[in-house]
Swiss-Prot record:
NCBIfam families the UniProt entry points to: pgm_1, PRK14115.1
Enzyme class: isomerase
Pathway in which this enzyme or protein is active: Carbohydrate degradation; glycolysis; pyruvate from D-glyceraldehyde 3-phosphate: step 3/5
Annotated positions for site Transition state stabilizer: H184
Lineage: Bacteria, Pseudomonadati, Pseudomonadota, Gammaproteobacteria, Enterobacterales
Keywords: Gluconeogenesis, Glycolysis, Isomerase
Protein name: 2,3-bisphosphoglycerate-dependent phosphoglycerate mutase
Keyword hit for Cell inner membrane: no
Source organism, top-level taxon: Bacteria
Quaternary context: Homodimer.
Record's keyword annotation contains Isomerase: yes
EC number, as in UniProt: 5.4.2.11
Length: 230
């Protein structure tokens, strides 16, 4: 029986990553370096002979473009791809579009670290009059107003990512499918917290770099056995 494997990967560097801005739900494209990261990831995946049955990503183009590059470069563009807002980055509320260093100077390192890395703390809410509010984005027109976050903690992100894992992705793993998930720093932190049973206090130390394929191997009972970067 073949080993059950999933690759988790954060998108390549985005234009706002390069500018050190909070991005969240804003639909920002890749930099040249971000595209290069995706191509290098594809090279590693191909070198290690990973053949995928299915792929998942968010509805944000930095993740979608990264996935496209990987599938193209590994000659797997034909596999089924499913996109969901449930895999989006966490919503950074009123911080979206702002420079991280300027926010640190205004609020202090400790507060910004809590907003960025803690499990339960939310950034300030986004006002509905703000142009970055998701209500103005056509991608979310089918969602009800109460489903549109104006800010999210990692816990709130966890509460949308994990049901998607359990009801959409896990059934494919149970069928012995090899799966590729290209998502975002915090949607992946939420999933890794769940898979590794990481405590609320320890999750603050987990950071995920852009463009690095992380392999999870699972037992026949779908329990994580080990994980490693390619």
């Amino acid at each position: 029986m073949k080993k059950k494997k999933i690759i988790l990967m954060r998108h390549g560097e985005s234009k706002w990553n390069k500018l050190n801005k909070f991005t969240g739900w804003q639909d920002i494209g890749l930099t040249k370096n971000g595209k290069k990261e995706a191509k290098l990831a594809a090279k590693l995946i191909k070198k290690n002979n990973f053949i995928f049955d299915i792929a998942y990503t968010s509805i944000l183009k930095r993740a979608i473009y990264t996935l496209w590059i990987i599938l193209k470069k590994t000659n797997q563009i034909w596999i089924p791809v499913y996109k969901s807002w449930k895999l989006n980055e966490r919503n950074y509320g009123a911080l979206e579009g702002l420079n991280k260093e300027k926010i640190k100077k205004k609020y202090g390192d400790e507060q910004v670290q809590l907003w960025r890395r803690s499990f339960t703390v939310c950034p300030p809410n986004l006002n509905i009059s703000n142009k970055y509010h998701p209500i103005y984005d056509i991608k979310y027109k089918k969602l009800k107003k109460h489903e549109l976050p104006t800010s999210e903690s990692l816990e709130m992100t966890f509460n949308r990512v994990i049901p998607f894992w359990e009801f959409k992705i896990l059934p494919q793993l149970e069928k012995n499918k090899n799966i590729l998930i290209v998502a975002h720093g915090n949607s992946l932190r939420a999933l890794i917290k769940y898979l590794g049973n990481i405590s609320d206090s320890d999750i603050i130390d987990l950071d995920i770099s852009t463009g690095k394929p992380l392999v999870y191997e699972f037992s026949n009972t779908n329990k994580p056995l080990k994980y490693y970067y390619l």
